[in-house]
């Protein structure tokens, strides 16, 4: 399951993201964070961490360096 999620995220990074304006407020980017979280914690916990991160990525949220726990 983790490999499928990572493939979907990589597809987004390579096929969709280049057409959008850069807008992630964090380092690493939300998609990079998602790949690292899923690789490190598995599909369920890593997916939850990635979803929480994406929910925080808005103009009134934080910004800066935010590593995967």
UniProtKB/Swiss-Prot annotation:
It comes from the Bacteria. It comes from Chromobacterium violaceum (strain ATCC 12472 / DSM 30191 / JCM 1249 / CCUG 213 / NBRC 12614 / NCIMB 9131 / NCTC 9757 / MK). Could be involved in insertion of integral membrane proteins into the membrane. It is found in: Cell inner membrane. Pfam families: YidD. HAMAP family: UPF0161_YidD (MF_00386). InterPro entries: Membr_insert_effic_factor_YidD (IPR002696). GO terms for cellular component: plasma membrane. It is a peripheral membrane protein. Its main location: membrane. NCBIfam families: membrane protein insertion efficiency factor YidD. Belongs to the UPF0161 family. This is Putative membrane protein insertion efficiency factor. Keywords: Cell inner membrane, Cell membrane, Membrane.
